[in-house]
Amino acid sequence: MARPLSFHEDRLFPSDPATRSYARGLYALVKDLPIISPHGHTDPSWFATNAPFQDATDLLLAPDHYLFRMLYSQGVSLDALKVRSKAGVPDTDPREAWRVFASHFYLFRGTPSWVWLNHVFSQVFGFTEFLEASNADDYFDRITAALATDAFRPRALFDRFNIETLATTEGPHESLQHHAAIRESGWGGHVITAYRPDAVIDFEDERSPRAFERFAETSGQDVYSWKSYLEAHRLRRQAFIDAGATSSDHGHPTAATADLSDVEAEALFNSLVKGDVTPEKAELFRAQMLTEMAKMSLDDGLVMQIHPGSHRNHNVGLLNSHGRDKGADIPMRTEYVDALKPLLTRLGNDPRLSIILFTLDETTYSRELAPLAGHYPVLKLGPSWWFHDSPEGMMRFREQVTETAGFYNTVGFNDDTRAFLSIPARHDVARRVDSAFLARMVAEHRMDLVEAEELIVDLTYNLPKKAYKLDQRPDWARPATLRAAAE
């Protein structure tokens, strides 16, 4: 018989009774605040069409690299989990794939995925027993049946989750038709996009040739000419802003920036376009384009996010058989102080610019990132990211960053996920961890309770809204409830 599934109301709170009491009170202030999700990777077509999700495997398992990478590490084939390969979606029975997942669910004990998924199973679907092999079919049937109902369509879940803003991420070579459909539908949900130009900046990316072709189509520019290439970016950035975007996102291998002259930059671009691509030239161009994007932000106001330091697609065999984003991305050492200096020397004191830095290298928190953000007015620190968005990772971030950068040089939490149903769980974890961190400071008499109460609301709601300029969005983009309240 499966074990009972229950979520303790004090989960993730300190074990010391006095400190735990403070954490409870702080969490109570933010538990029901709206979710601000300013950076993520959900599919905008979900909200444009509002079509029902297919089944448990299609929604929860096959797209989630957090899940299938763990099972793959234990010898489970991706085909058995119905994960898409370059040949297409395998013909594996989705029920059988779910059974495989259920029989291996114990592998996630101690991981954030264990917390998130059990939150989804308990709070979203109402399960009262842990998932295991014996109840795999019951889980599959109940989840799949629920997904067929109107209450579990994407827009209904968006409203149920109390999401105020949700940002997706698209490239300049991609259509924004789904965002247009959302806006024209009359639905009040605030779903916006973000500008991610990596595929038309990184000449080492195998997607680059096709992305350039589509970039030319979407922008109407000759993107193989340097000046027209930059103009294409400006035009597409404005199109993204018209679709609600307030930020751009840059996932380069390193944090390198450069400040070449116009002549040098054009010569480098021309060389790359002609096919003379070397690792050194590709890296220099990526570095220069971060500075070019920053210069454009001075004019159009997009907040820059820099997500460096991932060795993408480390497993070459899996890349060849299944393509990108199959759980084989590995964190790398990342240097920021010298890497960012060219950009910061050029633009680091300009009040029109805002850059949010992320890292997969936790050794840089106190040595590089906190001192940089604690000095340069253009810099803020993004929350613990990807491999570190666990309760422990969130606590390490606060402990190592706060002493130098404080709280107000950070931007609150963002979930950065494709897993739509896990968004409330991820934000709940962040709210609990921040409550626990502040509770400890109150218990140690490092701040009083009133200060902690102000801070927990800022960390949860006000800071992400301000950092991503969501408090400046046009009236059409505000939820109907907020528009009505303002009238």
From Swiss-Prot:
Q: Which UniProt keywords apply?
A: Isomerase
Recall the GO molecular function terms of this protein's record: glucuronate isomerase activity
Record SUPFAM superfamilies: Metallo-dependent hydrolases
Pfam families referenced in this protein's UniProt entry, alphabetically: UxaC (PF02614)
| Matching Gene3D superfamilies | Metal-dependent hydrolases (3.20.20.140), uronate isomerase, domain 2, chain A (1.10.2020.10)
Q: Which GO terms describe its biological process?
A: D-galacturonate catabolic process; D-glucuronate catabolic process
Broad enzyme group: isomerase
As recorded in UniProt, its EC number(s) are 5.3.1.12
- The signal sequence is none
State the reactions this protein catalyses. Answer: D-glucuronate = D-fructuronate; aldehydo-D-galacturonate = keto-D-tagaturonate
Cited HAMAP family: UxaC (MF_00675)
**Record's family?**
Belongs to the metallo-dependent hydrolases superfamily. Uronate isomerase family.
Query: What name appears for this protein in its UniProt entry?
Result: Uronate isomerase
Q: Which organism is it from?
A: Caulobacter vibrioides (strain ATCC 19089 / CIP 103742 / CB 15) (Caulobacter crescentus)
